[in-house]
């Protein structure tokens, strides 16, 4: 369990520091037992610290089982030095991805699989070669996935708990998911390598992929209780649940509950995978999967009573699994399942009235301020039925939305609540939060005003109060206002401090400074999408910037997004774009050769669609620096996006394209003349008169 793992982790650190402590490896079986005999001190400290941690029932048994399982873990052998060297070179070649075409890479992958035949389990459990196995799986076709899956059957209970093999299982499930509805052909394609098949022929698996997934469930059956909180198996269990449900499995998303945020994103750069369906889309699955999924979910939570199920909500390892279970129960099986007394959401929240000082209210309050539990509450707020959400909001959350928004942890739950509120409730919440916006800005909690603006725009709520609050939160000088919003002042101050002192004060926390800068940029980008007084806060600041500051913003990877959004936003008026775009005319070459500034130059193309003379002046400046642009990667992209070859050779076609007209469909897009519009009005009147006469004749 996590607490015991932490103790083992501390011992591992001591072993690394002191060579003499390596003898403890032989005594490793007895030490956890001794420490489990006196858990009261640790448990008391955990409760008083506000961690809301309740040990799961049978936790000591699970720890003993896990310790014993680690000692009795099957050993599949080690790769010899020649095999290690070969697979290391294969890993480097896949990483470089310097194959001539897809066929050359396919032949290389086939050769690696032939070399790995009979050693698949060794490679999956190898610290250095398990990464190769993950990459091989990601570039394999469905037939190779089918063969490898068959090799792992019978060993999944061991593999999912292994530090390295568990990631191979996760990648295998994701890659095999699109093929569960296919019947893999037992006749391997022999059209390219008939001769090799005679030498390397291997018996074909008898089971289709769907049946193989059923075998995985059978292997893990009866062990769900401790696998939920096993640090290596838990992320594989999450993937398995999503595959059985046919839900998207996206491990690359920051919002994903599939994998840890520290997980390595292994793959082949620019490589094509065997997946026909992207991992971000829902898939069709066999009918047997739904019944299996329902049984697996019931087995996972049936061994826990309500108290320990709630304790799982604040468990660092078990919480993400519980999030997946709640999401699947409410979204996959329908929100009507929440009415069943044995449902997970009903066991977590038995009292839908949320009365004061009730058990349910105390549980929700504990989740709100818990860094781990708040993520489960976000999932519940996003997925729970409308009736339950309204009761939660009106009976508990409504009166404290402003105070919750100021809290660093509970504020994220507030964002999910804002996404579900109607127009009237959203207007009431806005009136609560608006007075707190200055303090939120001061504490760099800009994500709350950002989401509030987005929801007000979506629901049609007036944003003038937000504009006034933001105006009072920043400097009255428009130029300094944007610098404060984008955190340019603090960045310049940090740089100056580093150069003057050349010490650690300037390097105190660069991660938080970058995060604040990013959130400030996102807030400014959202503001410029709102018409009226709100967007004028940024538009007026952009016009007040000095040329030097404007260029520095354009070259900043984070802040330049605000310039791009302001140029292309529907809220920007022609008057603003006419004044603002002229400030770039003498800096086109400098910006086009910069990695961030080139995107600003690209945004100037649609921004000047109704200001042709400015666009033509910019094109002339680009044409004068043709050689420099063609020698630069980003410069060539700008040259292509501005259609400069067309500008040099067929100026008339370029002019039509610059004005937003297509030459081939010019007749269809040509605006009507006054005579044409008069004829259309006359024809409409004639048709109305004819219709009236026909009605009178019938009467």
UniProtKB/Swiss-Prot annotation:
This is Nucleolar protein 9. Belongs to the NOP9 family. One of its GO terms (molecular function) is RNA binding. The keyword Endoplasmic reticulum does not apply. RNA-binding nucleolar protein required for pre-rRNA processing. Involved in production of 18S rRNA and assembly of small ribosomal subunit. Pumilio repeats lie at residues 115-150, 151-186, 359-394, 396-431, 544-581, 583-620. Keywords: Nucleus, Repeat, Ribosome biogenesis, rRNA processing. Its main location: nucleus. It comes from the Eukaryota. Residues 1-27 have a biased composition (Basic and acidic residues). GO terms for cellular component: 90S preribosome; nucleolus; preribosome, small subunit precursor. Residues 194-204 have a biased composition (Acidic residues). GO terms for biological process: endonucleolytic cleavage in 5'-ETS of tricistronic rRNA transcript (SSU-rRNA, 5.8S rRNA, LSU-rRNA); endonucleolytic cleavage in ITS1 to separate SSU-rRNA from 5.8S rRNA and LSU-rRNA from tricistronic rRNA transcript (SSU-rRNA, 5.8S rRNA, LSU-rRNA); endonucleolytic cleavage to generate mature 5'-end of SSU-rRNA from (SSU-rRNA, 5.8S rRNA, LSU-rRNA); ribosomal small subunit export from nucleus. It is found in: Nucleus, Nucleolus.
């Amino acid at each position: 369990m996590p607490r015991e793992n932490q103790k083992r982790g501390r011992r591992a650190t001591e072993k690394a520091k002191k060579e003499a402590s390596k003898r403890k490896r032989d005594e490793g079986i007895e030490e956890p037992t001794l420490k489990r005999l006196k858990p009261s001190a640790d448990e008391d400290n955990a409760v008083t610290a506000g961690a809301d941690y309740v040990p799961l029932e049978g936790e000591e048994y699970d720890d003993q089982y896990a310790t014993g399982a680690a000692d009795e873990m099957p050993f599949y052998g080690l790769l010899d030095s020649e095999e290690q060297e070969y697979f290391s070179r294969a890993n480097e070649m896949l990483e470089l991805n310097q194959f001539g075409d897809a066929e050359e890479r396919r032949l290389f992958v086939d050769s690696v699989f032939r070399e790995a035949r009979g050693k698949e389990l060794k490679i999956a459990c190898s610290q250095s070669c398990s990464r190769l196995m993950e990459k091989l799986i990601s570039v394999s076709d469905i037939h190779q996935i089918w063969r490898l899956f068959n090799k792992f059957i019978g060993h999944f209970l061991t593999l999912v708990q292994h530090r390295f093999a568990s990631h191979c299982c996760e990648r295998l499930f994701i890659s095999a998911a699109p093929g569960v509805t296919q019947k893999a052909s037992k006749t391997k394609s022999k059209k390219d390598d008939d001769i090799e098949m005679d030498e390397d022929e291997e018996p074909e698996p008898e089971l289709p992929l769907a049946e193989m997934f059923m075998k995985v469930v059978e292997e893990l059956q009866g062990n769900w209780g401790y696998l939920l909180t096993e640090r290596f198996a838990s992320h594989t269990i999450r993937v398995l649940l999503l595959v059985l449900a046919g839900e998207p499995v996206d491990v690359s998303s920051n919002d994903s509950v599939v994998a840890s945020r520290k997980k390595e994103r292994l793959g082949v750069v620019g490589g094509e995978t065997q997946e026909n369906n992207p991992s971000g889309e829902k898939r069709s699955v066999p009918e047997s999967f739904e019944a299996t999924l329902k049984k697996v979910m019931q087995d996972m939570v049936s061994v826990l009573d309500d108290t320990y199920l709630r304790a799982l909500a604040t468990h660092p390892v078990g919480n993400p699994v519980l999030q997946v279970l709640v999401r699947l129960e409410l979204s996959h099986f329908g929100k009507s399942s929440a009415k069943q007394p044995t449902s997970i959401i009903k066991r977590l929240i038995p009292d839908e009235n949320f009365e004061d000082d009730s058990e349910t209210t105390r549980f929700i309050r504990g989740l709100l301020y818990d860094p781990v539990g708040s993520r489960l509450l976000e999932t519940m707020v996003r997925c729970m039925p409308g009736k339950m959400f309204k009761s939660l909001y009106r009976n508990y959350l409504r009166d404290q939305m402003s105070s919750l928004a100021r809290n660093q942890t509970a504020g994220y739950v507030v964002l999910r609540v804002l996404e579900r509120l109607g127009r009237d409730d959203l207007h009431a919440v806005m009136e609560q939060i608006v007075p707190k916006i200055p303090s939120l800005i001061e504490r760099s909690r800009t994500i709350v005003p950002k989401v509030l603006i987005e929801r007000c725009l979506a629901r049609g709520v007036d944003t003038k109060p937000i504009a006034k609050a933001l105006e009072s939160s920043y400097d009255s000088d428009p130029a300094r206002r944007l610098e404060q919003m984008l955190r340019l002042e603090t960045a310049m101050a940090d740089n100056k401090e580093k150069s003057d002192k050349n010490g650690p004060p300037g390097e105190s926390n660069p991660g938080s400074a970058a995060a604040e800068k990013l959130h400030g940029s996102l807030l400014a980008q959202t503001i410029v999408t709102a018409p009226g007084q709100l967007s004028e806060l940024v538009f007026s600041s952009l016009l007040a910037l000095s040329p030097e500051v404007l260029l520095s913003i354009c070259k900043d990877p984070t802040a330049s997004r605000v310039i791009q959004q302001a140029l292309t936003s529907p809220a920007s008026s022609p008057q603003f774009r006419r004044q603002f775009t002229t400030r770039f005319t003498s800096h086109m070459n400098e910006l086009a050769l910069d990695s961030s500034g080139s995107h600003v130059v690209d945004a100037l193309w649609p921004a000047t669609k109704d200001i042709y003379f400015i666009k033509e002046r910019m094109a002339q400046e680009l044409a004068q620096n043709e050689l420099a642009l063609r020698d630069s990667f980003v410069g060539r992209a700008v040259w292509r996006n501005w259609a400069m070859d067309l500008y040099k050779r067929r100026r008339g076609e370029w002019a039509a394209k610059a004005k937003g007209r297509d030459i081939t469909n010019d007749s269809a897009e040509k605006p009507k003349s006054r005579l044409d519009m008069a004829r259309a009005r006359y024809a409409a009147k004639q048709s109305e008169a004819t219709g009236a006469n026909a009605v009178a004749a019938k009467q």
